[in-house]
UniProtKB/Swiss-Prot annotation:
Coiled coil: none
Transmembrane segments: none
Catalytic activity entry: tRNA(Phe) + L-phenylalanine + ATP = L-phenylalanyl-tRNA(Phe) + AMP + diphosphate + H(+)
Cofactors: Mg(2+)
Protein name: Phenylalanine--tRNA ligase beta subunit
Keyword ATP-binding applies: yes
EC number: 6.1.1.20
InterPro entries per UniProt: aa-tRNA-synth_II/BPL/LPL, B3/B4_tRNA-bd, DNA-bd_dom_put_sf, Fdx_antiC-bd, Fdx_antiC-bd_sf, NA-bd_OB-fold, Phe-tRNA-ligase_IIc_bsu, Phe-tRNA-ligase_IIc_bsu_bact
Enzyme class: ligase
Species whose genome carries this gene: Halalkalibacterium halodurans (strain ATCC BAA-125 / DSM 18197 / FERM 7344 / JCM 9153 / C-125)
Record-listed Mg(2+) binding positions: 462, 468, 471-472
Length: 808
C-alpha cells in the first residue's frame, strides 16, 4: 500500500510531524514502512509555461522552435522535439539553471544552430514512472489544464514535493489497504482526531429504479449489490489534484469516471465498477454463477474461459464483469459515455480469490475483496463516488440506489481481563490507561470490575479474541515502553541424577567396547513386532490411530527388530561387521482397546555380527559368538558394580537360537536376554550369524551396585590351581562358579573359566568345564597344605550340589 503523506494530512492534523516520524511510529506500532519515496528526487527550477508560438525548426524536421511565456518579462525560446507540443498549451518548463531528477542540469544550448533557453518536460523527465503516465502523454510532453497559473511551480502543481510511504502489511491488517484505515491508525498512534469528509449523494432527477433492476441468484456468494445511476456525464481527463493522488498511489489516470472509482477504492478500500449504461445491453443486472466453459472478454482485451464456480455480473443474458475481479470490455466506459451505472457490492472473499487465482487475473479490486472489505462502508463509498463523478464529469446523480440483498455488519464483542493482560504483557496498566487506548483506537467498550467488553469497528476484522486486544494495547502503549524484566529464580547446583550417571556409564562403556549407538523409529509394522519381543511377548501391539503408513503403524514393544533392520541395511551395503546398540523406549499394553496410556519402559539392546577381531600378524581373526556378547555385558555389569548380582542362565526366547540363548538375571529377577538370532529368522532376513541382547534398563539401574574398593598392590605371591570338572550337559558354568566362590573362603580371589569341551572322549550327556582358581592372602604367603584343604572342600561341595567329578 502506497500512502501519500500530503493526502494523509487532509484527514489527520500532522503539523510539526514529518513523514519520517509517521513512518517510525507506524513501524513501531506494527505497520511496517519499507521505504519512503521522495517524489521530487532533487528537482528544482521547473515552472508552468505557456506556449505562445510553435513552428518547425529551420534546420531539423523533428524539432520545433517554441516561444514560451514563463512568468518573466520576456518569453524564452526553447527547442522541443516532443511530437505533441503546440501553441496555446500550458507545459512544464525547466528553466536555465534548473535541476531534474538524476542531477541533470539545464543550461543554455544551441540545437542545430538555434538557441534553446530551457526544456519543456515530459512527466517521465520529472520523475514519474512511465507506467503511471496517461496514454496521451506517454510519448510526449505533459500538458496542464487551463486553470494552472503561468509561472507557478510546476513541481508543486504536479504534487512532486510529496513523500509516499510504502507499507508492508501483514494479511490480518487489510483495514490499512486504504486511506480511511491508515488515517485512523495514524490518528490512534499520535492521539489525533480524524477529519473524514461526509459522503452523501443527493440524487434529484428521477429514480434509479426506472433505469435498472438488480437480481442476485446466489446470496451466499453475493450478499449485497447496489446500483447507482449518474447521467449526463462528460468523460474526459481528471482534474490535476485527482491525477496527482492516483499517481502517488501507483495508479495510472485513465478518465475522470474511472479515476473516481479508483480514487474511492484507495480512500475507502471499497472496490467499485463503472459500467456504460447504454452498452449494458439491457436495463437489468443479474449476478449469477458462470456456466462451465462460458467465455467473455475482460477490460484487458483478453478472452477468458470461465468455470462453474466463478461469479458473474450479467445483463440478464451475457456476462459484463467477473465479480470482484475485472469488468468486461463490452460495457467499458468510453469517451462517448453519457450515462454511468455505478456498482457497489459485497462479494464472498473465497469466491473472488478462487476466480482470481483460476484466471491468473489479480487486480486492486480482487486483492481487497479476497481479504474482506468493510460492509459498513459499501453504501458510503458508493455515495462518495457518485458525488465525485457528478463533480468532475459534470453529471447528475439519479435519485435512489437500486439494491438487492443485505449487508451483514458484524462487530463482535471481545472480553479482556485486565490482570490477565498485564500478566501476559509484563505490565501494570490501570483501567484508565487501557480505556484511553481503546478511545484512541475508536473501540467501543464497557467495564465491569477487571473485565472490558470491547466492540471493535467493522473495519477491524482482525479483532476476534482476547489476545488481539492485548496486541492493540501493547502497540498503542508502545512496545519500547514495555519494561524489560529478567527471569527470577534461585540458582541450584547442577548435576546428574544417579540414574542419569548410570545411563552415561552404560553409553561410555559400550562405546569403549567398540559398539556404535544408533537411534531408530519408535513406530514399526505389526508384522515386524511378531516373534522378537523377548520377555515382552505377552504384550499386545499398539496401533496408531492415523498412521503415516503401514510401515509406521504400530508402537514398538522391542528394540531388537529395529536393530536387525539396521544390520540388514548395512550388510546390504558391503559392511562385513557391525556392532551397534540403542537406548530407547518401548510401549507396552495388554489391552486390545486402550483405556489408558501404555506403559513406556526404557530398554537397552544391541546387535553384533561379523568378525570381532581382524586377521593381524598377532593372531587369527575371531568371529562374534555368544561369549563375546556375554563378555561385553559382564564388563558393563562390572562397571555398574553388579557383577556379584548378575547371572546368565540357559533359556529360550521367541525368535532366538534355543541352544545359544541365556536369560540375564539380577538377584534372581529376569532383566533381559542375550544370544543368537534363530537360524530360520537369520535366513529370512538374509543375515549372517547375528547375536543380540536386550535389557530392561529401569529394572537394571534401580539395583544398588557394589562400590569399587581400592586395595594395595600384593606383597606376597599368589597360588593358582586348575580344576577340570565333568558335569551333566545341563549344568552351567555359572552354577559351578557360584559354588566355587561360595566355598572358596577369603583366600579365593579369582575364578576364571578357561576351557569348555563337548564331543569325542566324553560320555553321552556330559561335558568338561575347566576353571583356574587363584588364592592369595595379603598378610602372608599361603602354604600348599592350606590351599589344598580349601581346594578339596570346594570339590566336595561341587560334587554334592551339581554332581561334578574331577576329570581324570
Amino acid at each position: 500500500m502506497l500512502v501519500s503523506y500530503q493526502w494523509l494530512k487532509q484527514y489527520v492534523d500532522l503539523d510539526g510531524i514529518s513523514a519520517e516520524e509517521v513512518a517510525e511510529k507506524l513501524t513501531r506500532g506494527g505497520i511496517e514502512v519499507d521505504i519512503i519515496h521522495d517524489l521530487n528526487q532533487g528537482a528544482t527550477g521547473v515552472v508552468v509555461g505557456h506556449v505562445l508560438e510553435c513552428r518547425q525548426h529551420p534546420n531539423a524536421d523533428k524539432l520545433n522552435l517554441c516561444q514560451v511565456e514563463i512568468g518573466e518579462e520576456e518569453p524564452v525560446q526553447i527547442v522541443c522535439g516532443a511530437p505533441n507540443v503546440a501553441a496555446g498549451q500550458k507545459v512544464a518548463v525547466a528553466k536555465v539553471g534548473a535541476v531534474l531528477p538524476g542531477n541533470f542540469k539545464i543550461k543554455k544550448a544551441k540545437l542545430r544552430g538555434e538557441l534553446s533557453q530551457g526544456m519543456i518536460c515530459s512527466l517521465q523527465e520529472l520523475g514519474v514512472e512511465n507506467k503511471f503516465v496517461q496514454k496521451e502523454f506517454a510519448d510526449g510532453i505533459y500538458v496542464f489544464s487551463d486553470d494552472v497559473e503561468i509561472g507557478s511551480d510546476a513541481l508543486e502543481a504536479l504534487n512532486r514535493y510529496d513523500q509516499v510511504l510504502e507499507l508492508d502489511l501483514t494479511p490480518n491488517r487489510s483495514d490499512c489497504l486504504n486511506m480511511y484505515g491508515v488515517a485512523y491508525e495514524v490518528a490512534a498512534l499520535f492521539d489525533k482526531e480524524v477529519h473524514w469528509p461526509t459522503a452523501e449523494s443527493s440524487g434529484t432527477d428521477g429514480q434509479a429504479s426506472d433505469y435498472v433492476s438488480v437480481e442476485i441468484e446466489d446470496i451466499e456468494k453475493n450478499p449485497y449489490y447496489g446500483a447507482t445511476i449518474i447521467k449526463n456525464v462528460k468523460v474526459g481527463p481528471s482534474p490535476l489534484w485527482l491525477q496527482n493522488r492516483l499517481i502517488a498511489a501507483g495508479i495510472r489516470p485513465i478518465s475522470n469516471v474511472v479515476d473516481v472509482t479508483n480514487y474511492v477504492l484507495l480512500e475507502y478500500g471499497q472496490p467499485l465498477h463503472a459500467f456504460d449504461y447504454d452498452r449494458l445491453g439491457s436495463n437489468k443486472v443479474v449476478t449469477r454463477l458462470a456456466k462451465e466453459g462460458e467465455k467473455m472478454v475482460t477490460l484487458d482485451d483478453v478472452e477468458r474461459t470461465l468455470q462453474a464456480d466463478h461469479l458473474l455480473i450479467t445483463n440478464g443474458r451475457d456476462p459484463v464483469a467477473i465479480a470482484g475481479v475485472m469488468g468486461g470490455a463490452t460495457s467499458e466506459v468510453q469517451e462517448d459515455t453519457t450515462t454511468v451505472l455505478l456498482e457497489a457490492a459485497y462479494f464472498d472473499p473465497a469466491t473472488v480469490r478462487k476466480a482470481s487465482r483460476d484466471l491468473g487475473l489479480r487486480s486492486d479490486s480482487s486483492s481487497r475483496f479476497e481479504k474482506g472489505v468493510d460492509p459498513k462502508r459499501v453504501r458510503e463509498a458508493a455515495a462518495r463516488a457518485a458525488t465525485l463523478i457528478a463533480e468532475v464529469a459534470g453529471g447528475t446523480v439519479v435519485g435512489g440506489v437500486v439494491e438487492a440483498g443485505e449487508l451483514a455488519i458484524e462487530e463482535p464483542v471481545v472480553s479482556l481481563n485486565l490482570p490477565h493482560m498485564n500478566q501476559r504483557l509484563g505490565m501494570e496498566l490501570s483501567h484508565d490507561e487501557v480505556a484511553a487506548i481503546f478511545d484512541r483506537l475508536g473501540f467501543a467498550y464497557t467495564v465491569e470490575n477487571d473485565t472490558f467488553e470491547v466492540t471493535a469497528p467493522s473495519r477491524r476484522g482482525d479483532i476476534r479474541i482476547e489476545e488481539d486486544l492485548f496486541e492493540e494495547v501493547a502497540r498503542l502503549y508502545g512496545y519500547d515502553n514495555i519494561p524489560t524484566t529478567f527471569p527470577v529464580g534461585g540458582t541450584t547446583r547442577g548435576g546428574l541424577t544417579d540414574y542419569q550417571q548410570k545411563r552415561r556409564k552404560i553409553r561410555r562403556y559400550l562405546e569403549g567396547a567398540g559398539l556404535f549407538e544408533v537411534m531408530t523409529y519408535s513406530l514399526t509394522s505389526e508384522e515386524k513386532e511378531k516373534g522378537l519381543q523377548g520377555e515382552n511377548e505377552d504384550y499386545l501391539p499398539i496401533r496408531v490411530a492415523m498412521p503415516m503408513s503401514e510401515e509406521r503403524s504400530t508402537m514398538r514393544t522391542s528394540l531388537v527388530p529395529h536393530l536387525l533392520d539396521v544390520v540388514q541395511y548395512n550388510l546390504n551395503r558391503k559392511q562385513e561387521a557391525l556392532f551397534i546398540y540403542e537406548l530407547g523406549s518401548v510401549f507396552l499394553s495388554k489391552e486390545e482397546t486402550l483405556t489408558k496410556q501404555p506403559e513406556e519402559r526404557e530398554m537397552l539392546a544391541g546387535a553384533l555380527t561379523g568378525f570381532w577381531t581382524e586377521h593381524l600378524w598377532q593372531g587369527e581373526k575371531k568371529a562374534v559368538d555368544f561369549f563375546v556378547v556375554k563378555g561385553i555385558l559382564e564388563g558393563m555389569f562390572a562397571e555398574l558394580g553388579l557383577s556379584e548380582k548378575v547371572t546368565f542362565e540357559r533359556g529360550e526366547q521367541p525368535g532366538m537360537h534355543p541352544g545359544r540363548t541365556a536369560n540375564v538375571k539380577v538377584n534372581g529377577r529376569a532383566v533381559g536376554f542375550a544370544g543368537q538370532i534363530h537360524p530360520e529368522r537369520q535366513s529370512e532376513l538374509d543375515l549372517k550369524e547375528t547375536y543380540v541382547f536386550q535389557l530392561d534398563v529401569e529394572s537394571l539401574l534401580t539395583e544398588e551396585g557394589t562400590e569399587v574398593a581400592y586395595e594395595p598392590l600384593p606383597r606376597f605371591p599368589a597360588i593358582s590351581r586348575d580344576i577340570a570338572l565333568v558335569v551333566d550337559e545341563n549344568v552351567t558354568a555359572a552354577q559351578l562358579q557360584q559354588v566355587i566362590e561360595a566355598n572358596g573362603g577369603e583366600w579365593l580371589k579369582h575364578v576364571y573359566l578357561f576351557d569348555l569341551y563337548e564331543g569325542e572322549h566324553m560320555e553321552a550327556g556330559k561335558k568338561s568345564i575347566a576353571f583356574s582358581l587363584t588364592y592369595f592372602d595379603p598378610e602372608r604367603t599361603l602354604t600348599d597344605e592350606e590351599v589344598t584343604a580349601v581346594h578339596e572342600q570346594i570339590l566336595k561341595e561341587l560334587e554334592a550340589s551339581t554332581g561334578a567329578v574331577l576329570r581324570g
